[in-house]
Amino acid sequence: MAMSLLQDWCRSLDVDAHRALLVTGIPEGLEQADVEAVLQPTLLPLGTFRLRHMKALMNEKAQAALVEFVEDVNHAAIPREIPGKDGVWRVLWKDRAQDTRVLRQMRRLLLDDGPTQAAEAGTPGEAPTPPASETQAQDSGEVTGQAGSLLGAARNPRRGRRGRRNRTRRNRLTQKGKKRSRGGRPSAPARSEAEDSSDESLGIVIEEIDQGDLSGEEDQSALYATLQAAARELVRQWAPCNSEGEEDGPREFLALVTVTDKSKKEEAEKEPAGAESIRLNTKEDKNGVPDLVALLAVRDTPDEEPVDSDTSESDSQESGDQETEELDNPEFVAIVAYTDPSDPWAREEMLKIASVIESLGWSDEKDKRDPLRQVLSVMSKDTNGTRVKVEEAGREVDAVVLRKAGDDGDLRECISTLAQPDLPPQAKKAGRGLFGGWSEHREDEGGLLELVALLAAQDMAEVMKEEKENAWEGGKYKYPKGKLGEVLALLAARENMGSNEGSEEASDEQSEEESEDTESEASEPEDRASRKPRAKRARTAPRGLTPAGAPPTASGARKTRAGGRGRGRGVTPEKKAGSRGSAQDDAAGSRKKKGSAGAGAHARAGEAKGQAPTGSKAARGKKARRGRRLPPKCR
């Protein structure tokens, strides 16, 4: 965390990280002048410095200070601790040798290292896989073999070191969250803390490859020179931007490289048609299949000395100036896979490269079954990015940039933000893969939290879709699935019973306002037609207020149910029958007003059948419930 804080402050304050120190453990409340007084006896002999920034740390009851030297400082002479007030102050800095680690922090994106059957089987006659403790204690000669495996093993299957190197690498590269043992060159004590803090951010270590590590391997030595030529040409594409001092060009980038042996290409051109397609199961043109594919991570270091120069080119580089030497030796790491399908180790590396291509959003859906086609399809696309073609050691190299680190950031930050690749407009419409950026305007958006939210939303959508299909398998409603109609129908079915009672009561209240506008005509067919709605009304209404029997006919011949209607209310069927008889002879206002008081509710219930219920029967039922109005007098 302290090293990340140092890098963040240097970036925000435009301070050279190699000339800066981070001092932690400063007591709270100490002023800047007091801090400078404590630091001067220790740091002033190293060079002129100034205190640029101080801030209290959130998780600690202490402050941190950023110190900047005017000139380059000898990091070996910087003490780790400075005696100060209320304790010891710790000092951290970024060594130039640590910058190569940025190229080794890509395994989370580049490698999906898991045991394969071919790797577990190994080669007959080889020793078993050494444990993690033995991997750490290996001498420098064994370390050379481990580092060389990341550039791809030699194609000769008779070499016994090949399987051992791959298995050793698998022990070293484990997933984040598990205790891992680092192979390769042991880190110095000055680099151990930064090694832990930065490696945990991505969970992987990828050893950088130097020419000295490949001194005994002719094939890999030539491969190193070829990949270095590709990295050098890619770096030169941004040389004009960096020369202006604006540092607009990215310092680190990820590229896909194909290497083709010119002599083998000429032999392939002389072969009869169909021979290449039988040897290699792919639909690519026989002249378009390279000998190997590499995923290359390059870091431009214009301000730094090269870690290890190529011994074969050291004589020629000594005569050139320092800038040319640094430009001709960019730092890089690579994962190499040969295209020969008969090599199980090559297929393992090809699958890893294909997984990276897919995670970056460059692969097509139709090519996912064939890893080689999936990788080669990227080279045939118009990426609108930097692309170079060079020849080195009798090999043709074609390289295209897949991912850049923007805003003077490093590749680790670029990978962490999962920025979308620079695709042309027509390619952006196509699927860019799961890890492609889903922001149209900000290419660096789309972190891990957004990715988890997207995955959760997709899973929830699938679950809801499946549950909806199962729910509608035996449904009674014939509505289009997924439409608004099916939702409304489902809600209507659930609220059917409750809405009946509410609608009946509401219709009774409205009937009083419309009673003077309706007219009732007493007839036997109308009485029979309106009998069913009233019977239903009697079943659903409260027992204490609802009549129990059916109303009689106009002639008084109907029979009532046991118990009668309107018990204790002074309303009898005879009085109602007499009221209906007088309504046919007299058109007085009292007959219309009181005889049709409850006709509105049952008129709506019989509208669907084109019938209007009589007013006297509806009025009788309503009055029996309310119990307030007296029946009309018979004349």
UniProtKB/Swiss-Prot annotation:
Q: Where is the composition biased (Basic and acidic residues)?
A: 261-273
Q: Which spans does this entry mark as compositional bias, Polar residues?
A: 133-147
Where are stretches of biased composition, namely Acidic residues? 302-329, 502-524
What's this protein's family per the entry? Belongs to the PNMA family.
Q: Where is the composition biased (Low complexity)?
A: 541-557
> Could you tell me where the Basic residues compositional bias lies?
156-183, 531-540, 558-568, 619-635
Name-wise, this protein is Paraneoplastic antigen-like protein 8B
Annotated region (Disordered) at 115-202, 260-332, 492-635
Q: Which Pfam families does this UniProt record tie to the protein?
A: PNMA_N (PF20846)
Extract the InterPro entries matched here.
Answer: PNMA, PNMA_N
Native species: Homo sapiens (Human)
